[in-house]
């Protein structure tokens, strides 16, 4: 296993932005993480047939969609039902929780308070996501939200921290 550059981690999927493999980083104990295991992305709703085949050939066999029911209804995943890819939808932005967003979170000048609130108010959903990861140790897993930033970024940061990535790599990837 070897270190991959940022360019080597980027998957070439024209209809999506922010699609990258989380593998190929050196961990704190000197090992390198495996590529073709976890891929973070934006919503794969507009994939062409060739792009679906590219992701399939890349090894994607599980998709964890972190979007709300409304977002999924507006633009369903093109990978849902494609070949033998398993699809899971775990809504990480429960609308019932957003209605009670504490004022201290609303008043933050950055998103850090929102991320903490998201973690605290969606513990069961985060558990479900990591349970899916645990159940598929040999499959490549793609996880996404709409833009591939906030919800996807939190999951990616947690995975990277669990795997022992250097903090600067976690921040840089985020």
Residue locations for each model-derived region?
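Ser/Thr-glycine-rich phosphate-binding loops at phosphate-binding pockets of nucleotides
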Residues: 147, 151-152
């Amino acid at each position: 296993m070897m270190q991959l550059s940022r360019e080597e981690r980027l998957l070439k999927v024209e209809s999506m932005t922010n699609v990258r493999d989380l593998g190929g980083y050196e961990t704190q104990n000197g090992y390198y993480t495996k590529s073709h295991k976890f891929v973070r992305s934006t919503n794969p709703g507009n994939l062409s047939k060739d792009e679906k085949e590219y992701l399939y050939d890349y090894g994607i066999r599980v998709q964890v969609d972190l979007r709300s029911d409304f977002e999924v209804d507006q633009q369903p995943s093109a990978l849902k039902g494609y070949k033998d890819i398993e699809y899971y939808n775990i809504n990480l932005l429960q609308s019932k929780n957003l209605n009670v967003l504490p004022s201290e979170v609303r008043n933050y000048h950055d998103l850090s308070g929102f991320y903490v609130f998201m973690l605290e108010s969606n513990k069961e959903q985060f558990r479900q996501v990591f349970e899916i990861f645990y159940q598929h140790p040999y499959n490549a897993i793609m996880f996404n939200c709409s833009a591939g930033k906030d919800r996807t970024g939190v999951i990616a940061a947690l995975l990277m921290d669990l795997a022992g990535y250097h903090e600067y790599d976690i921040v840089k990837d985020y």
